[in-house]
Amino acid sequence: MSACPCNIVILPVEILKNSSKDTKYSLYTTINRGYDVPRLKYGIIVSPRVHSLETLFSDLGFDKNIEKSSLYLLLNDPTLAYPNFHEHFEQLKGETNKDLSLPTYYIPKVQFLTEAFDSEHTLATIGYKPNNKESYEITGFTSMGNGYGIKLFNYSVIHMMRSHKCKRVVADIIMEHDLLGYYEKKLGFVEVQRFKVLKEQHQVKVFDDKVDFTKDFHVIKMIKELGNHRL
């Protein structure tokens, strides 16, 4: 079967932390652009996902364990997404299963990046930060088009299972953003808890950053066991 036309860049946060302002700013704006879609559509959350370039890593929760956190990007054409791409990134050998070929994975072959990622060629983003033993939490999950988020989630999870021995992933979602069905039916998560956040709790620390919001909303905690993960 023909190879999957997917290109996934794996960015260890330890390398990203040392990278240039241009590199970090491009990811900061891309992630905020993805979160702006539900933020503006539903009008509940006022503050951007990442408040500033200086709070990029703390707002996404990477600062708690930078060494074991990663950010994945789904790119349509790596050579258009990052200048002189192959001088800065090298390919990981893809593994093929019976159903389809896996995408091409790339990792940095340098200790810091200097250029900006072109947001027009970045189709989705997802970050993973340690939650507890053999468990990681999703952060910075965006999709710039139909199906891109699902594709990146599935392929990034495969890499997390094989390279980080990840056995489960957890996620906190906002119920009023109509994400429950997406996480349950498309990604295979199950709900384990939900709680209400009251408007009177101004700037409550809901996720990893302080959130400004216009009315009460619910946070749903979800989990996915990866033992039976299938594409």
Swiss-Prot record:
An annotated GO BP: sporulation resulting in formation of a cellular spore
Cellular compartments annotated: Peroxisome
Origin superkingdom: Eukaryota
Keyword annotations of the record: Meiosis, Peroxisome, Sporulation
Any one GO cellular component localisation term in the record: peroxisome
Function, in words: Required for sporulation. Required for meiotic nuclear division.
Protein name: Sporulation protein RMD6
Gene, per the UniProt record: RMD6
